Amino acid sequence: MHPTPDALIVIDIQNDFCPGGALAVAGGDEILAPVNALLEAYQVKVLTQDWHPAGHGSFASSHPGAAPFSVTTLPYGEQVLWPDHCVIGTKGADFHPDLNTDAADLIIRKGFRAGVDSYSAFFENDHETPTGLDGYLRTRGVSRLTLVGLATDFCVQYSALDAARLGYDVTVREDACRAIDLDGSLEAARKAMRAAGVVLEG
């Protein structure tokens, strides 16, 4: 019997989330070296990529008079309205050039449906529409996941919570993540992840 493979899920290390990008996470480029090192250490390696059409419903610019980082209600619930970011075909949507994308087995693109955002690597923000990642991991025999990337309190947190809900053993390596920390969102994310049984390391 082969041991169950562990998977590394690398969340959204894209130009728009790194310094100089449209939705830059402070220190977002500082995690590239530790993430690249981790990519050498795991059997199963998945990258996620935020991938929005122009005029996406989560963009503040799609809601006349709305300010970036304000909150609105969309058909699936509350939604933070973001600056335009990770628009399909733009440099901002590309992976950071220093990320070792060649190491990945799979790239999951999310948020490409114009009417619903997708923070999680597993489900869109309606919490129902799957990305296909769960099926991929199960057919690879994976039961343990380590999550790294951007941003701790949004896409990493949502991915970790969904993974725990789906029955995976989940670890988040905080030393290989960075947070937006919008109005205390980082501490709230840590509490939610711990409550769900997610292990926070680093």
Predicted regions and their residues:
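Extreme N-terminal starter segment of soluble prokaryotic enzymes
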Residues: 2-8
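Short glycine-enriched, charge-decorated loop/helix-capping segments at active-site entrances
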Residues: 21-28, 121-125
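Active-site alpha/beta core segments
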Residues: 33-144
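Histidine-anchored nucleotide/phosphate-binding helix
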Residues: 38, 156-167
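Short internal beta-strands
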Residues: 46-49, 169-176
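Glycine-rich anion-binding loop/nest that anchors nucleotide
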Residues: 142-155, 174-178
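Short, flexible loop segments at boundaries between secondary-structure elements
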Residues: 172-186
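Short acidic-hydrophobic, aromatic-tinged amphipathic segments that line or gate anion-handling sites
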Residues: 199-202
